[in-house]
Amino acid sequence: MIVSMRAVSLSALALSSLVLCACARWFPAPVPMRSVEWAQPAAKPRARCLVVFLPGMGDDAEDFERLGFVAEVKKHDLSVDMVAAHATLGYYARATFPERLATDVVEPARARGYEQLWLIGMSLGGLGTLYYSRGHAADVTGVLALAPYLGERELSDEIRAQGGLASWHGPPRVDVMNGNNYQREIWRWLQAVTRGQEPGPNIYLGYGRDDKLARQDELLAAALPEGHTYLIDGAHDWTTWKVLLGRFLQSSDFARSCR
């Protein structure tokens, strides 16, 4: 059976129905995880910071260059090397995403001695920035989550009904995330990080007002410090995400520290 990634609806991002299920065989997850790199020109000093891009569902590592993200970063003349991970849905479906990203992409790159590691991802990749950071808090300096998928609507409605993330009565921490608990655990972790109760990266969020995920993303926005959310007119698409990336590259701790 051939399954088109782009034909899968956004609801398929509900990993609770995909992790460790038979349907995972429809979504490839090659080992090692493939990646594409863009390094500083040889004439420049060694880059201080590493950016790891994580694609959305149906996208691939090369899209970050093809759709202008790499050029946008280069335009700002930052001390940055970039690598895009081909972190497709199959890795999430098999629950191997954090391990493969660490082993195949992040650790080999970090061996070069970067001072900071930043993750940038959209939609499924936005979730990935948080999913990975929860288990690697000491390694990740910060993230830019663009229109991240943050679980099913019923959960975000529950959080909203309780007054938002700050007042939500979340579950106890779990040691191992799986398809049954990852959504609540991500939100619980976000609550703990934004309260200063657990270590975590410097979180930045960007999304368009007309994005299909805006109602859940605004719950996270309300819990972040001032200046850590970029909100513009736009939808769930690369055009909007590229503008949001530009805002982040102009005004963020990343922009200030990776020069």
Over which residues does each language-model region extend?
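Non-catalytic cap/lid and distal C-terminal segments of serine-dependent acyl enzymes
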Residues: 24-259
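Residue-level signal for mature regions of secreted extracellular proteins and peptides
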Residues: 16-17
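C-terminal motif of bacterial Sec signal peptides marking the signal peptidase cleavage site
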Residues: 20-22
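Bacterial N-terminal signal peptides that target proteins for export
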Residues: 2-12
